[in-house]
Amino acid sequence: MSHLDNGFRSLTLQRFPATDDVNPLQAWEAADEYLLQQLDDTEIRGPVLILNDAFGALSCALAEHKPYSIGDSYISELATRENLRLNGIDESSVKFLDSTADYPQQPGVVLIKVPKTLALLEQQLRALRKVVTPDTRIIAGAKARDIHTSTLELFEKVLGPTTTTLAWKKARLINCTFNEPPLADAPQTVSWKLEGTDWTIHNHANVFSRTGLDIGARFFMQHLPENLEGEIVDLGCGNGVIGLTLLDKNPQAKVVFVDESPMAVASSRLNVETNMPEALDRCEFMINNALSGVEPFRFNAVLCNPPFHQQHALTDNVAWEMFHHARRCLKINGELYIVANRHLDYFHKLKKIFGNCTTIATNNKFVVLKAVKLGRRR
């Protein structure tokens, strides 16, 4: 846990999933402080929109203004709810919207934590363009190293005149005034042909590797299991290309597409509808934090390309949680398949959780591993 003192309230905040005590990561950053310093209670008029509030620092600080928290991360929503509870703040003080929803009209203040993906930022700025006014105060913040010329140019292009502040504690702010500059329309998704198939893969703005098949997925697809039955999970599904391939290779199986990103799940659904509509009755689409709340002993197999970062921070906490959830939800003799960068040493992590691990394939960068749920472990 960490403490954030600001002009609105003193907060105790924690990351979600929680980090270990040996390598603790803070649930807020200097950019959060810097953004809050710009506001005065007396100047907030109209709806408050907060975009990409990773762990709820801004939402908790401004809870009395009933802000809207907008983003593409279910984990961030869970983190914000947890931190609201931790600080004794009514959860209903914050209204949650995903990035594909319609934003509230004529906001008084918009606070943006600049996301890692420029495409997501553009999608969000285009959505804001429909609702902000010249009187809306628009402020964005991030680590100084993450604000580039291209970031400023995007604000200028979509919203209007943009300036940046001096760095403070290695954070920098962007101030923008809306003047409705001319702007061409843009498609909601980017699409490309998947080589070796007749499929067209569609990707919403925040999908990993949205402009082409990433090399880890490419390697994984060469080693996917075939002729499985029952339920299979594409965990952390992204655009669903792994799950789509599983549907094709396992015609007797049902595939559950799971991701914490609403845009990822929407992309997966769109890709099944577009490329294998006849298989829709064998699909389930789930926005979730890994397999939270899913009953144990349900699945025959779980397939996963786990992330090793959360927002801008490098961490294996998300992957570790995915592995534990997979083990809980697999049937006895059910199998977990993962692809990962070799340097992450997931072999020993899986062996610790499952009691076994087998290397299926390896190249100079990636490894495909399999672990089997052999029985109940104390």
Curated annotation (Swiss-Prot):
The keyword S-adenosyl-L-methionine applies. Belongs to the methyltransferase superfamily. RlmG family. Gene3D superfamilies: Vaccinia Virus protein VP39 (3.40.50.150). It is an enzyme of class 2 (transferase). This is Ribosomal RNA large subunit methyltransferase G. It is found in: Cytoplasm. It catalyses: guanosine(1835) in 23S rRNA + S-adenosyl-L-methionine = N(2)-methylguanosine(1835) in 23S rRNA + S-adenosyl-L-homocysteine + H(+). InterPro entries: DNA_methylase_N6_adenine_CS, rRNA_m2G-MeTrfase_RlmG, RsmC/RlmG, SAM-dependent_MTases_sf, Small_mtfrase_dom. The keyword RNA-binding does not apply. Keywords: Cytoplasm, Methyltransferase, rRNA processing, S-adenosyl-L-methionine, Transferase. It comes from Escherichia coli O1:K1 / APEC. Its EC number is 2.1.1.174. One of its GO terms (cellular component) is cytoplasm.
